[in-house]
Amino acid sequence: MQVIQDIHEQVEKASSGFRLSVENLLQVGFNIFRKAPAEFMVFSVFGLLVFSNPISGLLLGGPVSASYFHMAHRVKQGARIEAGDYFKGFEKFGELIKLNLLIFVVVLLGLALLIVPGVYFAVSYTFSHFFVWFFQMEATEAIRLSRKTVSGNFGQVFLLFLILGAINFLGVLALGIGVLITMPLSFCVVYAAFDDIIEISN
């Protein structure tokens, strides 16, 4: 109960306003990636297969994202990435699928009405997977807490969103192979952002 209370207090504090240094987050994310580049790149072969297909991305994207964040957290804590960590996110398969489906429906409805609401929801739910994976929240509570957290400085999170999108676009241009670097790097940067706003305990 104490952990749940603490995370709600952290979210409440974040919603009142926070500042992010995009340059610092890119550096922190890169430092995490460079400590285990081979492990991240190997997992990204599977990640690419999942995210390159809309259906598999919708159904498996949640657990894959959680696995990336889990690995980034282990590296930051000074631990080695082991084979079992690659699919750790699948331990919460059901809740993460539910989360992805909820996000998909809400963002799709937003895009159907106007593009702006869809983009708003997509950015607002950036941190949803963290609340499910690290804090055992249900999907509906996770998207609520993510939106509330991002509301503390939507502009900077959106800017980070754009920069990571540009980085991955460059990865695609590099014969597609570059994505094996830019995709895990992006997950490490998003992890760094969330950890900066809502500190993840051991």
Can you say where each PLM-predicted feature lies in the sequence?
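N-terminal leader/transit sequences and adjacent low-complexity N-terminal tails
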Residues: 1-12, 18-22, 26, 34
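Interfacial aromatic "cap" segments that immediately flank transmembrane helices
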Residues: 20-49, 83-109, 123-172, 202
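Selective recognition of hydrophobic, aromatic-rich stretches within alpha-helical transmembrane segments
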Residues: 3-13, 52-80, 104-144, 172-202
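Residue-level signal for short amphipathic helical patches enriched in basic/charged
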Residues: 17, 36, 63, 78, ...
